[in-house]
A protein has these predicted regions:
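Short, intrinsically disordered terminal tails adjacent to the first/last structured region
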Residues: 1-22, 580-584, 588-593
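Noncatalytic, solvent-exposed loop/strand surfaces
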Residues: 26-576, 580-583, 593-595
Length: 595
């Protein structure tokens, strides 16, 4: 072979190169580095789901944070694999284009056709079609019965007249009938009635043979009174307004308070009404935001999940949260005359949270307590002077405070919240100079992380849902006694030595209130949708509801005693054995009285 031919076979400078070999260099299989990355992301996601991340970063990781972190890890894994396939793999260009454009089309289709209706307590979304209306907008106003005679609105011995029961601490009085925990086929809870209801997280308050709650139907928040025996509407009072957010849901979230035949109700949008229980007539009404000079739009940003404080009846006034922003600073609480609706006084200087005003007894003295956005403050209920305060930081548009304070000793107040904060106990008493002092007794950042549930106290121990799992702490030092039973972001009441747990998915569960361990006694399939509402128990009558339906059950009592308010029915609901583990046309509306 000649020298000239050898030179002709060599690449000449500036000659073009066939791109085929470079394209062929891409592999059809992912490289080792991608496999290692995907395995690492999968392992991290499994650690997060197993709760192991809490041991690394502490109690700030709740169910919602776990879901967010898991979503980020899964998204990172999918995007890593997708980018490799589209940019580095040796697959045909047609396959790459098909996958890329197909995914873009699916994303665009989802954005165009789906909407997030709401999320669970752990931020799991529920979707609906973009053209589908919210369920509450499809409901007509409830049809009311003829007005009741005044004599029909008489109290009963075991009324549940306010949020969290007669004493407002999630514990029924010792005089309440004892529940029989043997929910067997022979003696199950019996369903008395069931009916659709509008949106909202309000609970029931009972007075004699009546049950009152709040609901959202379309653009109206409605005070609804039902016959306790039948569930039939007796009257309703609509109020124009609608609160709705993806994270907080739709509708009112406070529970009415009833005394002397008068219903006091507060809406999520800032109104307060006093209604005659016998007739449904509005006696007086107030726009609390306008009355206090609060900018409504700015208030909705600051208190993002809607006003949730239930009215507190204190002597001759009704006390509700105040709020802000306003020109001369926020107001913690505001009181209105129960008879006339005239504003009587305001106290405090903290932005409101989602905790209701409370009257507690500490050190032999009564205190009006406001748990706000940054402080817990105690006021003398007579003079309204501030007696004490201690910091309890939160933000009412993010890591909010929602749980009621609980007295756990002669001089000790317990307080808790979710979002990784946990709980603490404070000793409150008079100092040497007569001024009241506050000293932290103990703190448990990993215990009783009550996101928007409440705690019951019984025989020296505290019981509550901590990040969705039932937990028992010793009140003297905050030590965890046990933790077990996932009921998600539900609610609970204590009836004697039993905990009545309303799980977020809808089941009602009986659990023994004992520090010995988690002992589930019985389970009732009461509701079948997301439930953040607190249950109510009046004698042997259990009232439950969520944003879709309400139901009434007759519970078996020890000794076979019954409550005449709710008549029995023939059909019994489905009761599961304990786990062996630790509308028609709108009704006429009564014209409200002038504000």
């Amino acid at each position: 072979m000649s020298t000239s031919r050898k030179r002709s076979n060599k690449q000449r400078p500036g000659a073009s190169v066939d791109p085929a070999p470079a394209a062929a260099a891409g592999s059809l299989w992912p490289p080792r580095r991608l496999i290692v990355s995907l395995c690492s992301l999968a392992a991290a996601a499994l650690m997060v789901r197993a709760g192991l991340l809490e041991y690394v970063v502490g109690g700030i990781v709740d169910g919602a944070v776990r879901n967010i972190i898991t979503l980020i890890l899964c998204f990172s894994a999918v995007m890593s694999a997708l980018l490799w396939f589209l940019r580095e793999s040796g697959h045909a260009l047609a396959w790459k284009q098909m996958l890329g454009y197909g995914l873009l089309g699916l994303v665009a289709l989802g954005i165009a056709t789906l909407r997030i209706e709401r999320v669970s307590g752990d931020l799991v979304p529920e979707f609906r079609w973009a053209w589908q209306k919210s369920r509450d907008t499809l409901l007509a106003r409830p049809v009311a019965a003829p007005p009741q005679a005044a004599a029909a609105w008489e109290p009963a011995p075991h009324d549940f007249p306010r949020f969290l029961g007669p004493t407002g601490d999630a514990s029924l009085p010792s005089t309440a009938p004892a529940l029989d925990p043997e929910w067997t086929k022979a003696t199950p809870p019996r369903e008395v009635w069931r009916r659709p209801i509008g949106a909202g997280w309000s609970g029931f308050a009972t007075y004699g043979t009546h049950a009152v709650t709040l609901e959202q139907r379309g653009d109206e928040e409605i005070i609804t009174c039902l016959a306790l025996a039948t569930g039939e509407p007796e009257w309703h009072v609509p109020v124009r307004g609608r609160h709705q957010t993806v994270l907080g849901g739709t509708g009112p979230r406070s529970t009415p308070s009833i005394a002397d035949g008068i219903v006091y109700a507060a809406g999520a949008t800032g109104w307060l009404h006093a209604v005659d229980g016998a007739t449904g007539k509005v006696l007086w009404k107030k726009d609390v935001l306008a009355d206090l000079g609060i900018d409504a739009a700015a208030h909705e940003v600051a208190v993002a999940w809607g006003r949730s404080g239930s009215p507190l009846l204190l002597d001759d006034v009704v006390v509700v949260p105040g709020g802000g922003p306003r020109s001369d600073g926020p107001v913690s609480l505001v009181a209105y005359d129960r008879a006339t609706g005239e504003r009587r006084w305001t106290v405090g200087d903290d932005q409101i949270s989602y905790v209701s005003p409370a009257l507690v007894s500490i050190g032999g003295r009564s205190f009006l307590v406001a748990v706000g956005e940054s402080q817990a403050i105690g006021f003398d209920p007579v003079t309204r002077d501030e007696a004490w305060r201690f910091p309890w930081p939160s933000h009412s548009n993010s890591d909010a405070s929602c749980s009621q304070p609980v007295v756990i000793g002669p001089d000790r107040l317990f307080i808790s919240k979710g979002y990784g904060v946990g709980c603490a106990a404070f000793d409150i008493g008079p100092g040497a100079d007569g001024a009241w002092t506050v000293k932290e007794a103990w703190r448990n950042k990993a215990g009783l992380k009550t996101k928007f549930t409440n705690v019951a106290f019984h025989e020296g121990h505290l019981y509550g849902l901590s990040d969705g799992i039932l937990e028992c702490l010793r009140a003297s030092d905050g030590k965890r006694m046990w933790k077990g039973g996932r009921y998600d972001q539900g609610q609970l009441l204590r009836a004697g030595n039993l905990l009545v747990v309303q799980s977020e998915p809808g089941d009602v569960v009986l659990v023994e209130a004992t520090p010995a361990g988690h002992r589930e006694v019985a389970r009732l399939a009461a509701l079948s949708d997301q439930t953040w509402n607190s249950p109510a128990i009046a004698g042997d009558t259990l009232l439950v509801r969520n944003a879709v339906e309400a139901a009434c059950y007759r519970l078996p009592l020890r000794g076979g005693a019954t409550n005449a308010a709710a008549a029995p029915v023939e059909n019994a609901p489905s009761v599961e054995p304990a786990a062996d583990v630790s509308e028609p046309a709108p009704a006429p509306v009564v014209e409200p009285a002038a504000a």
